[in-house]
């Protein structure tokens, strides 16, 4: 197993550069998408009402596209219904302490820390990982203000770590990072959905009300199923002058009292 398959990271050259105004996505706010059979059927039937002027090739392509969308929506509908059955969700039931709180899914790599198999002089942690019988050292840098950020998040939300990296790396790193026990649960790569070459964090599988669920992640691909629930964050590698997490604290303080995150995020996204 290669080193790169252990840790899922953003590449420095692909990092999404966000302005302060862009900390919250500019996509339009929406209520939870009604993934129901009627919507899926509508997509199927829509292709039958294309104008007669369309060429047979265009019509065939349109039908194929509509049918693909319908199947995708129907599948996600069935998946959503399945994960509403007790015992099938990724997360345990909400504790009494977290009743009424918003659930915030928080990414690890390039959001809270940056890790490397190459030696780093000022590493905050050095974590040994065994790969195919050989022990390798992983050097971990903490993002500036991560301790303050996690402490405040733990006071306000039900916090869940969700990473596309493997548990054999992410679990010991989180043990060192989260000394105060902010994360109520930890989810790793096996809990992701592999979709079009990317590991996606499907929030509908958590077992939480999507109107009371947020995700903080540096990779838009991670929340492609639920962009309306996302608070984007700029990828971090080694800039010790970075203040992104510090700047996010007042944003999350405002969101913590939301009855519906779609409405509150929409207000934050408004120009």
Swiss-Prot record:
GO-annotated cellular components? nucleoplasm
Quote the record's cofactor note. Answer: Binds 1 Mg(2+) ion per monomer.
**Name assigned to this protein:** Carboxy-terminal domain RNA polymerase II polypeptide A small phosphatase 2
Question: In its UniProt record, which GO terms are filed under biological process?
Answer: negative regulation of G1/S transition of mitotic cell cycle; protein dephosphorylation
An annotated Gene Ontology molecular function = metal ion binding
The residues responsible for catalysis, as annotated, are: 107, 109
Give the top-level enzyme category.
Answer: hydrolase
Where is the site described as Transition state stabilizer found in this chain? 163, 201
């Amino acid at each position: 197993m290669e080193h790169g398959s252990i840790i899922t990271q953003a590449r420095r050259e692909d990092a999404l550069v966000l302005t302060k105004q862009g900390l919250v996505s500019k996509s339009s706010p929406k209520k939870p998408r009604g993934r129901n059979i009627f919507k899926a059927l509508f997509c199927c039937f829509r292709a039958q009402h294309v104008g007669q002027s369309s060429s047979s090739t265009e019509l065939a392509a349109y039908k194929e596209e509509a049918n693909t969308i319908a199947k995708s929506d129907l599948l996600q509908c069935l998946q959503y219904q399945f994960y509403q059955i007790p015992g099938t969700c990724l997360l345990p039931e909400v504790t009494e302490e977290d009743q009424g709180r918003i659930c915030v899914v928080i990414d690890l790599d390039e959001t809270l820390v940056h890790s490397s198999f190459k030696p780093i002089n000022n590493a905050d942690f050095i974590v040994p990982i065994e790969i195919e019988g050989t022990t390798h050292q992983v050097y971990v840098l903490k993002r500036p203000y991560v301790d303050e950020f996690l402490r405040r998040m733990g006071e306000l939300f039900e916090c869940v770590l969700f990473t596309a990296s493997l548990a054999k790396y992410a679990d010991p790193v989180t043990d060192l990072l989260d000394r105060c026990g902010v994360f109520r649960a930890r989810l790793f790569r096996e809990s992701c959905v592999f979709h079009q070459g990317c590991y996606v964090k499907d929030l509908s599988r958590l077992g939480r009300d999507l109107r009371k669920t947020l995700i903080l992640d540096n990779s838009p691909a991670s929340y492609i199923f639920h962009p309306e629930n996302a608070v984007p964050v700029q990828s971090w590698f080694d800039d010790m002058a970075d203040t992104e997490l510090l700047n996010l604290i007042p944003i999350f303080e405002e969101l913590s009292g939301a009855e519906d995150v779609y409405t509150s995020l929409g207000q934050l996204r408004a120009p």
